Amino acid sequence: MALELLTPFTKVELEEEKKESNRKQIGILGGNFNPIHNAHLVVADQVRQQLGLDQVLLMPECKPPHVDAKETIDEKHRLCMLELAIEDVEGLAIETCELERQGISYTYDTMLYLTEQHPDVDYYFIIGADMVDYLPKWHRIDELVKLVQFVGVQRPKYKAGTSYPVIWVDLPLMDISSSMIRDFIKKGRQPNYLLPKRVLDYITQEGLYQ
C-alpha cells in the first residue's frame, strides 16, 4: 500500500519528529457508526500503521449536521457496538466527548476542546477522499486546519485535489456502508463478514434495524 504526502513533510520526517519529542500522535476517525463495520476498522488500523500513529480514536457523533436524526439509533447502542468492535484490538480506542457534550457535532468545536484538554497531542483527522472536496464548506475550516492535520483516505491511483494540507493514504476499495448493512437486515438478509460477528450478534439480540 502506497503512502503519498501532499504536505511539507514526509513520513520519515514525521517519525523523526516523534523520536525527538514526547508529543503523542493520535488519529481521529469520526462517524455516526450506525453500525460500525469492517471498512471503518480497516481505515482506522491502516492509517495508524502507515503513519506510525500511537493510537486512533473512533469518535461517535451525537447529532451530525448532515445526518437525518430519524435514521440514527440511540447513542447507547452505537457506543456498545463500538466497544464490541474494538475489544482486544491493538491501537484503537473510543473518544466520547461529542456524545457527552450533546448537541450538533461540529468538528471545529470538538477539536478545539480536545487540543485544549490534551496540549501534548498532535491530532490527525481522518476523512474519505469524497469529503476532501467539501472541506471549503466545513464549519470554520481555516481555523480547523490549524488544530489538526487532515488525513485523506483514497483508493490506489485515485487523485483528489485540494488547496488544504492533506496527508494521503492509499487503501483498497471496500464498498461497505452502514446504510447497506441496515438495508440487508431490514430485508431479512444476514450481513455476514461485513462487520464484526460480536457486533452482528448484538444487533440481532437487541432487534436493531428491523
From Swiss-Prot:
Its EC number is 2.7.7.18. GO terms for molecular function: ATP binding; nicotinate-nucleotide adenylyltransferase activity. It catalyses: nicotinate beta-D-ribonucleotide + ATP + H(+) = deamido-NAD(+) + diphosphate. One of its GO terms (biological process) is NAD biosynthetic process. InterPro entries: Cyt_trans-like, NadD/NMNAT, Rossmann-like_a/b/a_fold. Belongs to the NadD family. This is Probable nicotinate-nucleotide adenylyltransferase. It comes from Streptococcus pyogenes serotype M6 (strain ATCC BAA-946 / MGAS10394). The gene is nadD.
